Structure formats: C-alpha cells, structure tokens
Amino acid sequence: MYTKQDIHRQLSEMGVPRDSIILMHTSLRAVGEVEGRGCGLLDIMIEYVTAEGGLLCIPTHTWKNLEDLGKPTLDRNSDYTCIGTLPTLAVRHTAYINGKEYKPHRSRHPTHSMVVYGDEEKAKKYIASEELSESSTAPGGCYGKLPAMGGYILLV
C-alpha cells in the first residue's frame, strides 16, 4: 500500500513542481492500494501540489452525455463524470490539510470540465469563462491555458 510519504517522495524524485499548474489524469485501478483510497490520493496530491501555491487540475469530462440529447452535458448539481472514479470523487471532495480547507472549483465547460484545487482566488481565475470556449482546448480555456502558463500534465 502506498502512503502519503511514498507518493510525496516519488513526486519529488520526478521533479513535480509545487508552485505550478498540474493537470493530473489518473487510473485509480492502475495506481493500486493507496492509504485512504481515492479520497486519500486526492488529499495527498492536493497537499503536495498546492504547498507552494500550485494548482491541481483534474479532468471531470461529461462528453458521454452527448449520446442522450435529452440530458444536459454538464449538470452542476451532479457529480457525474464519464472518465473514472477519481474525477467523480474530486467533484465533491473537500480536503482539510494543515488546518486549511481546499474546495473543488469545477469549470463550466459543457463537455470537458475540470476541477481545480488550490488558492481559491487563483483557482476561480483559472476556470473563469471556461463555458465560453469554442472547443475543449481553446487558447483561453483551461486546457489551452496549461501550456501558456507553464503548466504540466501528470499521468498517474
């Protein structure tokens, strides 16, 4: 079973910055047993990435809803995502780390939303106007901003 210390050490050894934007895509099944399961992994990653002002971004796509024209693609009252367990947990997971609360801030892109954890003002600014993006990777959208702001993609 992986502990917080194991994962923090591995991230540090890989050179994952703690003051940048990190887009994390995960397969919880591929990761294996983690202390605290899915919510434990979220807490571990939030603590590591936000320690020096970074933002942790987790895709929470809902594009699968396009198959049912009677359903909205993004329902802000639902925790539905079509890309796995960790993204679904992230939609509603609030982390409490060292006495500080980290709430998820979900972008409003109709098919390619993401949850962002970190400084509340920075997170809200990062996802602002996402619903106006003309594509899932528009330059002004969350995915388009990632390279422009020196962000990283972490496949876990």
What do the predicted segments below correspond to?
Residues 66-156:
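Internal, conserved structured core segments that host functional sites
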Residues 7-16:
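A short, well-ordered alpha-helical element
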Residues 15-71:
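N-terminal active-site beta-alpha-beta segment that forms phosphate/nucleotide-binding
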Residues 1-6:
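N- or domain-start disorder-to-order transition segments that initiate the globular core
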Residues 12, 43-47, 88, 144:
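Surface-exposed alpha-helical segments enriched in charged/polar residues
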